[in-house]
Amino acid sequence: MDQKKFYITTPIYYPSDKLHIGHTYCTVATDAMARYKRLQGYNVKFLTGTDEHGQKIELKAKEAGVTPQQFVDNIVEGPKGVKDLWKLMNISYDRFIRTTDDYHVAAIQKIFKKMYEKGDIYKGKYVGKYCTPCESFWTESQLVNGCCPDCGRPVVDAEEEAYFFRLSKYADRVRDLLVNTDFLLPRSRVNEMVHNFIDPGLEDLCVSRTSFKWGIPVDFDPKHVVYVWIDALFNYTTALGFMNDKYPDSDYETFWPADVHFIGKEIVRFHSIIWPAMLMSMDMPLPKHVYGHGWLLLDGGKMSKSKGNVVDPYLLAERYSADALRYFLLRDFPFGSDGNFSNELLINRINMDLANDLGNLLSRTTAMADKYFGGNLPIEQDEGPEDAALLEKARGLRDRYEADMEAYAFQNALADVFEVIDNANKYIDATAPWVLAKSEDTKPRLARVLYNLAETLRICTVLLQPFMPTTCEKIFAQLNVEADGKTWDSAAAFGTLPANATLHKGENIFPRIDAAKELAELEALEAAQKAAAQAANAPAEEKEVKSAESGAASAELIGEHEEEITFDDFCKVELRVAEVRACERMKESKKLLHLTVFDGERERCILSGIAKWFAPEDLIGKKIGIVANLAPRPMMKGKYVSEGMIFAADTDVDGGCSIAFFPDSTPAGARIH
């Protein structure tokens, strides 16, 4: 019988900067699923990679003083780059694609031409709004408060000659796919796609650009570069040899369509609407599932490289082990929902589950076997009534685990395993091996208790392999498990270990962590890491710019105590609520933000020295407090005029900053008393 196949992918990540814990979360989940299917005996193909073209990369490379290719090479292949991170995290991908690979470039040109010749791509002119970070075009009606509906950042006016894909042609078929099949998971994502994007009317999609050069040229019209939709999405097929000779045709025939694409929920629209429509145009089979997982939140907000509010997976994996981090990511957060990340949660999970439960069970079992039998269990063993509950749980574990894994419910699958581990620890207390050891008459009973513990541990370890592969090999070594005891089939059979098993007392696989001490050290390490990164990325400012920044910072942030003023003097200050309508960084300064605010009567410009603490996109649409009757202040040698001051406060001795935000319901122009 032919071996069953399973093809799973991560998104291909955009290498504008080092990857963070959110990217690691998705990749670890994909790796766990791939390992699970291999454990079941499937022929698995696991693809990951990087999406390396686009205007943002071109701009980042220019800022860094290197070519775009050099820039992405460093992020992907350089020290602590993408590939190094996946090696550290023990990611078992079968194939890694870079969209700058020659075979992919050639294939994309063929795909673009085929869709053009079919009439599904045509030349026109794009006029509308464009979000550079998302590389997305939007109509006026799709904007939210004048900003990109995906990321909330400001958009710019764009007009250029472009090729378009007839997305509107496939609207009905895509709608039917989403509504009437389980193509998009979890199903809670379907209504958002249908009601927000399809039902209002799908417009044809811009699929080429002329305003930048870092991309794949359209071979029959080389002033155009192929836009991200075709370039990036078709990686899932070109990596299998589709329309190229890099890999054998049999790879595509064997593995396509994909069984599941794991993606972050922010790119569900691309994968559930644009991707199937393009495959329909190419008369290609559709993926079986697209699963849009939730975000890892930090302090209640989405992690973002551009915002700088990210967690470094290197620091955590090197400090606690890749397996501990892998386990935490998939144990603490339901895969389809958002979850709040914190170092405290990580350390508590390591202590509770890995040190107290799993590690303790292994060390107690092997230590007692060593102490009472020299590590060699006797073959004479007596069953007891206390055994039934544990054995029943252990024998039924694989079926419960399988049901959860097939639903991509990793949190539940791990909870099932650790419920049995918890039962095994309680079984030790119930059977009291130290009492049984006092009499030769109860030694056979003691041997059976230790065998039950070792065999329960073996079954649990088989099922933990997709999540903690290195740790599981250490446990197997201490339990002296042969290859046939590590298989999927063996997890359903209690009694695979020989009755006279030899157990080895080994290292403590997860030492307990001093939480208070560790959290303090982590905080210091992360602060030092962040400061070093900021210093490395901050070029020297011109003196005139620094002077302007210093003035803005001292006026808005320092707030030194001055001499007292009278009540009448204070009443002269006009304090009002204003809505931030636009905000951008300034080319002339790394510290100043240029805000356009509406004060209830007119828009005004305010320059504020808060760029170190706030990303522009985090302020747009917010209601803030301003000093509205401050005399206009020329800045940057008169190039700009700042027409007010925002409310900001020092938050710590290092010069942290917070801003007073007002509820959305507060009208712009409201007086502050």
Would you name each region that the model predicts?
Residues Y13-Y14, S136, F212, A232-N235, ...:
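Short, glycine-/Ser/Thr-/acidic-enriched flexible segments
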Residues D2-I121, E135:
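N-terminal Rossmann-like or analogous alpha/beta NTP/dinucleotide-binding catalytic cores
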Residues K118-A171, R175:
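Cys/His-rich short segments
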Residues E542-H673:
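Phosphate-backbone binding interfaces of nucleic-acid-interacting proteins
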Residues M89-F96, Y116-K129, S141-Q142, V156-A158, ...:
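Short secondary-structure capping/junction motifs at helix and strand boundaries
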Residues K123, K129, D332, S337, ...:
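Helix-rich, typically C-terminal accessory recognition domains appended to large enzymatic cores
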Residues M1-T48, Y103-A107, C151, D157-K371, ...:
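Structured secondary-structure scaffolds
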Residues I475-D569:
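Intrinsic disorder at enzyme termini
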